[in-house]
């Protein structure tokens, strides 16, 4: 059976399904909303959306290769035909991340309708993978009953993240209607400072005792595992103090009667609830942990941070550093490029561009100061862009390395002299190579290509090459030292990277250039 026949068979099977009632496990309040959203007028809109989706998918190679793949048009078709049971079946088979991506393709209203039709556990898993923008749209449309239901199904750390961005009144209502255990756990997490380890952790983990055997540990995992964030690492706790950790691998490879205290690792690395999230993520990266234990200031074990949350932190921090280095104001509310509004993009970019535009005044002042040199030696002007661009590129190279090194802990402000010594040597080599190549280029170009048009070509080659040599050294030193100085002073090294370095290096390179030109061509100037 070829691909086209498979597609026709799948379509025919769906066509043969009868119209189905809304699933019985959907609350009455939500059923009423769904009935309103699935009236005849709404169905016509759904048909239009489905036809547009089919046109887009007609040229999609992945869809052609997988006729049974769940697509936007197929999802809408099931909705139009009121085949709710089938819709639940096909969405259950999808990976949560893939289902979340598919839901985000739907418009806001259709996304809400489909989400309300999903099974609770399927909806909750997909919800965790959605973008902040899509999640906010759903949350804003939820009733309190739906919101409480979602919170109860979510892992506690994800639920706390969601509630952090909501108005205080809504949070209060939701917590009042939540179960006592959920309410107490969420209140604790919400009280930790933002960006601290406490706000990132979850208290849902597998708890073991030292006096247990491996067989008893497996029984404990079976009981606690459903609600635990991870079962790959279990924690041995006595009187709320962490005594050790034991991996699932160790349990599986041990005899059932083996005591836990014989196979647990008591050399435990922990972080405090007040530690910065980025520090925690770096520690997890350093030790290759999939989960990091968290203790309070008294040393009591309070929860764990899992690798998925650590990756999110590192991604956010990396994005923020890149934005700052590109002279863009970071925005916590921004999502993807297309998910961010035109106004937000402009608002992020304008402030730094204004600052840099005004700071370029210094470069203009330098140029004005040496105006006489342009009149006497107009050829000097043609080399200015190359000189400033090369110096700026050199500065950006080392500043990028320094910002990355500082972020990863590979370089510290105390390494100032070591970095200085290394960059002097590196920049001397780079400057010498660039200077020699450029000097040869200028001499050959203006001797043969522009033969007879310019005098003292050798002088120009010397001026530009020597200027380039010293400009490269200057740029490398400025680019390397500024981020270190910023870190030492408590400022963000990324801010001191590309934006300021380019301005400083441009002005200094021009001063060097014209001073060297004056020395070489002092009679002509």
Predicted regions and their residues:
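Juxtamembrane boundary at the C-terminal end of a transmembrane helix
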Residues: 510, 514-525
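Membrane-water interface of transmembrane alpha-helices in multipass transporters/channels
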Residues: 369-383, 450-463
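Membrane-interface segments at loop-to-transmembrane junctions
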Residues: 339-348, 412-427, 462, 488-504
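Hydrophobic packing positions in regular secondary-structure scaffolds
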Residues: 2-332
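Alpha-helical transmembrane segments in multi-pass membrane proteins
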Residues: 96, 352-360, 383, 387, ...
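Juxtamembrane "helix exit" motif at the C-terminal ends of alpha-helical transmembrane segments
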Residues: 357-374, 437-452
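Non-transmembrane, extramembrane segments of multi-pass ion/lipid transporters
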Residues: 309-345, 396-421
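Hydrophobic, small-residue-rich transmembrane alpha-helices and their short perimembrane loops
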Residues: 366, 379-398
């Amino acid at each position: 059976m070829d691909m086209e026949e498979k597609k026709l068979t799948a379509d025919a099977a769906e066509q043969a399904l009868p119209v189905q009632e809304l699933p019985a496990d959907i609350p009455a309040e939500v059923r009423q909303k769904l009935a309103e959203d699935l009236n005849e007028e709404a169905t016509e809109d759904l048909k239009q959306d489905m036809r547009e989706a089919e046109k887009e998918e007609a040229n999609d190679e992945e869809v052609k290769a997988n006729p049974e793949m769940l697509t936007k048009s197929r999802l809408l078709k099931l909705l139009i035909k009121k085949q709710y049971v089938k819709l639940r079946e096909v969405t259950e088979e999808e990976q949560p991340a893939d289902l979340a991506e598919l839901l985000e393709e739907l418009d806001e209203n259709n996304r809400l309708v489909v989400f309300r039709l999903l099974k609770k556990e399927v909806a909750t898993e997909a919800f965790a993978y959605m973008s902040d923008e899509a999640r906010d749209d759903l949350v804003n449309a939820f009733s309190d009953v739906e919101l409480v239901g979602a919170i109860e199904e979510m892992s506690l750390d994800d639920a706390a993240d969601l509630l952090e961005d909501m108005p205080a009144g809504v949070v209060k209502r939701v917590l009042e209607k939540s179960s006592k255990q959920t309410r107490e756990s969420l209140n604790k997490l919400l009280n930790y400072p933002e960006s601290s380890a406490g706000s990132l952790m979850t208290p849902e983990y597998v708890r073991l005792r030292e006096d247990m055997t491996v067989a008893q540990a497996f029984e404990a995992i079976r009981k606690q595992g459903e609600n635990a964030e991870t079962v790959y690492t279990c924690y041995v706790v006595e009187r709320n103090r962490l005594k050790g950790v034991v991996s699932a691998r160790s349990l599986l490879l041990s005899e059932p009667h083996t005591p836990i205290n014989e196979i647990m690792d008591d050399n435990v690395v922990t972080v405090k609830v007040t530690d910065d999230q980025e520090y925690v993520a770096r520690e997890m990266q350093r030790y290759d942990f999939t989960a990091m234990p968290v203790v309070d200031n008294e040393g009591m074990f309070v929860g764990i941070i899992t690798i998925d949350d650590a990756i999110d932190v590192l991604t956010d921090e990396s994005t923020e550093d890149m934005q700052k280095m590109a002279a863009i104001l970071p925005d916590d509310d921004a999502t993807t490029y297309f998910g961010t509004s035109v106004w937000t993009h402009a608002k992020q970019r304008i402030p730094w561009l204004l600052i840099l535009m005004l700071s370029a005044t210094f470069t203009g002042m330098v140029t004005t100061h040496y105006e006489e040199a342009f009149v006497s030696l107009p050829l000097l002007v043609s080399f200015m862009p190359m000189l400033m661009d090369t110096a700026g590129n050199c500065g950006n190279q080392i500043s990028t390395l320094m910002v990355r090194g500082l972020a990863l802990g590979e370089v510290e402000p105390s390494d100032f002299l070591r970095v200085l010594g290394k960059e002097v040597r590196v920049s001397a080599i780079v400057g010498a190579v660039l200077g020699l190549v450029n000097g040869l280029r200028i001499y050959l170009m203006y001797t043969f290509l522009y033969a007879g048009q310019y005098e003292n070509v050798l002088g120009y080659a010397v001026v530009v090459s020597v200027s380039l040599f010293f400009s490269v050294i200057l740029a490398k030193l400025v680019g390397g030292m500024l981020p270190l100085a910023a870190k030492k002073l408590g400022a963000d090294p990324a801010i001191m990277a590309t934006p300021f370095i380019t301005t400083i290096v441009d002005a200094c390179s021009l001063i060097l250039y014209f001073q060297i030109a004056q020395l070489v061509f002092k009679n002509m100037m």
